[in-house]
């Protein structure tokens, strides 16, 4: 049967339907059931990540273990090395056994700012006294190698004096505990509190008393605030702790305070600390540190100026720095030693030393000390000191009491007044209360300016608290001179304040050397003991003759003031150029600048006096001939006559070229020369003819010969 179109259409429709059904069935199969197993590629990635993480973690654990092991080995190695050859830069402070709890020897500060933490702990444990720094090799005289300087110790001044005394007197004291704080070189701050018996061979040398008993008066006068220094006497033990707690030392200083007071810190200058208020408890460490920092911020000057760590800052006013300005390396050690051991000076920005002087004025008669040694017998270690304020002394003609027992404040601390003629000597005496060092200096300079400089010698009586200013006595000696060397005071109750003038070598108070020639006067006593002078005030000025002589020798140039002002200022602005000019100049003729004035003139006659500007011989002064060739009397013309010749040949009378002076003029000239050569003849002075006398220039520098 032939297929027709209708059948073909039906077949096509059937085929299409079958295919559609099949497609639908397969699609349903693909989406209907889930995937049985994941893709194998993804499974490989997960396995790799897990293995890598395990490997990295294990590596980190092993590395950290190795590093910890190395660090522990390095610590042991460092400890052994430190035991054999000591670390160079250490700062050592000495502590009492009972004052501070022993720290753990294995303590390691891990914070990155180990320097600050260690410094704070060191500052809180150490005392704030003046520092004395020295070398261990220099102390024990056993420098093994020249490059090995040994450990450098820094003690307080009290410890230093105790060390010196302990070498002489055998004190039965417990051994030291030494806290050594090394610099933070490695990452840790090692603070080992072990008492190194092997490192320091004299570690058993004891410096401190045990905390139970106070200091004996054997080696130290108990009046000294810094032990061993009888000149900076502050007060007794409890009085000093009660009145001025800001000056009490912290721990390591062997002051005459109780051990409880040592561990106590007052919160400010006003609070009072009794001796038994706070015992040395174990929990006082952080509180002590906090109170230390609070006190350091609250008080005026850290502590009071005598109990402050000396800044090793060399200023040009200190002599150790001014002796050589740049400081050669050979002098660095000496400069550091000197700056450390010299007494603290008042720096520029420091607050005035008011609290200490107020304390001395308040203490008055209430505080009694054993009297210090005779003042000039053993001079203090610092060079020049000046006695600024003295508390009440004993009732005797040598040291009369200056004020009553109940004096309050430094306003009543008046300087000693001279007798009645001196009582109205001017307002600069009536109101003098030395607030600090600088007002003391100002008052000294006022006295020096008010006095008569040219009265007599330098030391004698040119300044005696303004003695010649108010009285009509001129340059006479003071009416009631004090005893010749100041005798040691008979009474114990006296507190001294010794200030160091920055002039370097201000001499200790006493009579000058020239005063021994004075006949001892027997003066009548004034009415009241307050009018007696305590001690002559030192004259810091020099008289005009010495001053002029010093300046002449200083500059080797008699005509220095004749130069124009611009050149002079230029020379002062460049002192090295001036010194080079001097070096070439000092062996040449000092009168060379006056040579153009006398260039056209011949030498004067042989018998005449030398011109003033001839080269100076040894022993001549600048402005005039020496004593053997003194000038004429009061009526003489001070100009030196010089004969002026007209230009012409020697055979002048034969040739009519020159005009001879008349006979009367020659007579006058001869009379003038006669008058110059024979000065005792003073009857009628002859007025020299101006045409024939030339005045040689004299320098305006009128320093007496």
UniProtKB/Swiss-Prot annotation:
Residues 371-382, 479-488 have a biased composition (Pro residues). Residues 567-585 have a biased composition (Basic residues). Coiled coil: none annotated. Residues 267-284 have a biased composition (Gly residues). The modification Phosphoserine is found at residues 299, 304, 507, 528, 621, 699, 703. Residues 383-397, 591-614 have a biased composition (Low complexity). Residues 344-353 have a biased composition (Acidic residues). This is Voltage-dependent calcium channel beta subunit-associated regulatory protein.
């Amino acid at each position: 049967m032939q297929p027709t179109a209708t059948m073909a259409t039906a077949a096509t429709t059937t085929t299409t339907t079958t295919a559609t059904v099949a497609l639908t069935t397969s699609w349903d199969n693909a989406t209907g059931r889930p995937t049985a197993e994941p893709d194998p590629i993804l499974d490989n990635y997960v396995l790799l990540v897990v293995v890598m993480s395990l490997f990295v973690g294990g590596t980190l654990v092993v590395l950290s273990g190795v590093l910890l092991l190395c660090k522990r080995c390095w610590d042991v190695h460092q400890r052994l090395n430190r035991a054999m050859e000591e670390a160079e830069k250490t700062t050592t402070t000495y502590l009492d056994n009972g004052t501070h709890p022993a720290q753990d020897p294995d303590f390691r500060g891990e914070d990155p700012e180990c320097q600050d933490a260690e410094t704070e702990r060191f500052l809180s444990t150490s005392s704030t006294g003046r520092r004395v720094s020295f070398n261990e090799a220099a102390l024990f005289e056993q420098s093994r190698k020249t490059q090995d300087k040994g450990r450098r110790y820094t003690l307080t001044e009290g410890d230093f004096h105790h060390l010196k005394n302990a070498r002489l007197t055998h004190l039965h004291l417990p051994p030291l505990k030494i806290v050594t704080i090394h610099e933070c070189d490695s990452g840790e701050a090692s603070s080992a509190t072990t008492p190194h018996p092997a490192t320091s061979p004299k570690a058993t040398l004891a410096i401190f008393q045990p905390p139970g008993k106070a200091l004996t008066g054997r080696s130290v006068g108990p009046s000294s605030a810094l032990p061993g220094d009888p000149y900076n006497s502050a007060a007794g033990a409890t009085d000093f702790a009660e009145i001025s707690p800001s000056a009490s030392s912290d721990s390591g200083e062997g002051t005459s305070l109780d051990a409880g007071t040592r561990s106590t810190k007052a919160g400010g200058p006003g609070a009072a600390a009794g001796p038994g208020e706070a015992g040395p408890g174990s929990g006082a460490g952080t509180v002590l540190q906090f109170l230390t920092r609070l006190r350091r911020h609250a008080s005026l000057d850290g502590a009071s100026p005598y109990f402050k760590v000396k800044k090793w800052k060399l200023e040009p006013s200190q002599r150790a720095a001014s002796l050589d300005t740049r400081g050669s390396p050979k002098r660095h050690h000496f400069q550091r030693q000197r700056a450390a051991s010299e007494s603290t000076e008042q720096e520029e920005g420091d607050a005035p030393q008011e609290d200490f002087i107020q304390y001395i004025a308040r203490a008055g008669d209430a505080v009694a000390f054993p009297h210090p040694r005779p003042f000039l017998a053993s001079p203090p270690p610092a060079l020049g000191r000046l006695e600024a304020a003295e508390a009440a002394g004993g009732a005797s003609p040598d040291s009369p009491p200056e004020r009553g027992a109940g004096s309050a404040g430094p306003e009543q601390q008046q300087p000693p007044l001279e007798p009645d003629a001196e009582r109205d000597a001017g307002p600069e005496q009536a109101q003098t209360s030395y607030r600090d060092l600088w007002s003391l200096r100002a008052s000294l300079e006022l006295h020096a300016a008010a006095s008569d400089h040219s009265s007599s010698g330098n030391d004698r009586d040119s300044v005696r608290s303004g003695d010649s200013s108010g009285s009509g006595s001129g340059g006479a000696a003071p009416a009631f001179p004090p005893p010749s060397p100041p005798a040691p005071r008979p009474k114990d109750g006296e507190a001294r304040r010794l200030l160091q003038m920055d002039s370097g070598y201000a001499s200790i108070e006493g009579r000058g050397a020239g005063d021994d020639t004075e006949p001892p006067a027997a003066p009548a006593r004034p009415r009241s003991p307050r009018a007696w002078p305590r001690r002559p005030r030192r004259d810091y000025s020099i008289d005009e003759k010495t001053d002029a002589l010093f300046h002449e020798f200083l500059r080797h140039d008699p005509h220095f003031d004749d130069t124009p002002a611009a050149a002079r200022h230029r020379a002062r602005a460049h002192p090295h150029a001036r010194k080079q000019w001097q070096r070439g100049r000092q062996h040449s003729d000092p009168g060379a600048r006056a040579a153009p004035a006398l260039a056209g003139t011949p030498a004067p006659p042989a018998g005449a006096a030398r011109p003033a500007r001839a080269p100076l011989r040894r022993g001549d002064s600048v402005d005039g001939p020496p004593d053997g060739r003194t000038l004429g009397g009061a009526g003489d013309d001070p100009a030196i006559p010089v004969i002026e010749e007209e230009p012409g040949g020697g055979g002048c009378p034969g040739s009519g070229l020159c005009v001879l002076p008349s006979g009367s003029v020659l007579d006058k000239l001869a009379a003038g020369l006669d008058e110059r050569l024979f000065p005792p003849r003073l009857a009628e002075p002859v007025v020299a003819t101006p045409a024939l006398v030339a005045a040689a220039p004299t320098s305006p520098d009128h320093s007496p010969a």
